[in-house]
Each structure stands twice: as structure tokens, then as C-alpha cells.
Design a protein with these regions (language model features):
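Bacterial N-terminal signal peptides that target proteins for export
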Residues: 1-12
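C-terminal motif of bacterial Sec signal peptides marking the signal peptidase cleavage site
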Residues: 18-21
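Bacterial signal peptide processing site
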Residues: 23-26
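N-terminal secretory signal peptides
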Residues: 30-71
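Polar alpha-helical coiled-coil and adjacent low-complexity
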Residues: 49-51, 75, 143
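Extracytosolic low-complexity repeat regions of secreted or lipid-anchored proteins
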Residues: 78-143
């Protein structure tokens, strides 16, 4: 009789382990949609390793500046690329660890172009004032 409860306890522990393992998802939800032609990064823009270029999505455009995000195959690294209009060499990109809510990275490029990449479900009330929310995941300084 003691083996039945032990088996049941083992099954419950395995189930709990599997369920908690699924709850730690780190990916950015905006990358879940199908890509469109506008999502393709310009050929002259590179993304740092370990980002997968094929995951790139255009999330916002402001004053002609395009904001792309991409992530690694395991979704633990997220990247932001800020691309000014035209074939400008002034683009910049960077990556950071996507381990939970909050700021993943802040980029500052030539000419003072700045942007922050946020993880999903970030609390904007805890961020420094003076930023404009372009999307759930991208902040830029107030004009």
C-alpha cells in the first residue's frame, strides 16, 4: 500500500516540475507573429551573436528611424537595432540577457540616438522619467 502513495507523490512532483519549467518563458511576444517584408533587416545591418537574424521584426518607426528587435534561438538573448533613414552608416545594435521584466539594454549611437529595449511585462512606473513608449518593448527619450 505504501507504493501507491509513493508513485502518486512522484507523479505529482514530476508534473509540478514540468509546469514550473514552462512558466519561465523568456521570449518577447512581439516576435511571435509571422514576418512581413518590412521586418527584414537592411542588408548593411548586422546583429551580434547569438541573435538569429531571421527572428527580426520591425517594431516601430519614428521620424524615419526604424527600431528592429531579434532574439537568440533559445530566446534568452534579445537584441535591438536602431536604423536611421536611408543607407546611413549611423545604425547601431546591441544585445542583452532577457531574463525577466525590466530593461534588457540601452543603446546610444552616433548623434546621440538612444533607445531602450524592455522585456515583456516590464513595469514602466519603475523606469526613469523622460522616456516615450513606442511599443511595449521599446522606449526612446522624450523629444
Amino acid at each position: 500500500m505504501k507504493q501507491v502513495p509513493a508513485r502518486l507523490a512522484t507523479a505529482l512532483m514530476i508534473t509540478a516540475f514540468l509546469l514550473t519549467g514552462c512558466s519561465g518563458q523568456t521570449g518577447i511576444k512581439a516576435l511571435d507573429r509571422d514576418a512581413t517584408p518590412e521586418d527584414a533587416l537592411p542588408a548593411f545591418v548586422s546583429v551580434p551573436d547569438p541573435a538569429n537574424r531571421d527572428t527580426a521584426r520591425l517594431l516601430a518607426t519614428r521620424d524615419g528611424v526604424r527600431y528592429f528587435i531579434a532574439e537568440s534561438d533559445d530566446s534568452k538573448t534579445a537584441c535591438l537595432a536602431v536604423v536611421p533613414p536611408g543607407d546611413s552608416p549611423g545604425w547601431h545594435s546591441g544585445c542583452g540577457q532577457n531574463t525577466g521584466p525590466g530593461k534588457i539594454l540601452e543603446l546610444q549611437g552616433a548623434g546621440g540616438a538612444t533607445a531602450s529595449l524592455l522585456a515583456d511585462d516590464s513595469d514602466l512606473g519603475k523606469l526613469d522619467p523622460g522616456w516615450t513608449k513606442l511599443t511595449e518593448n521599446i522606449l526612446v527619450p522624450d523629444p
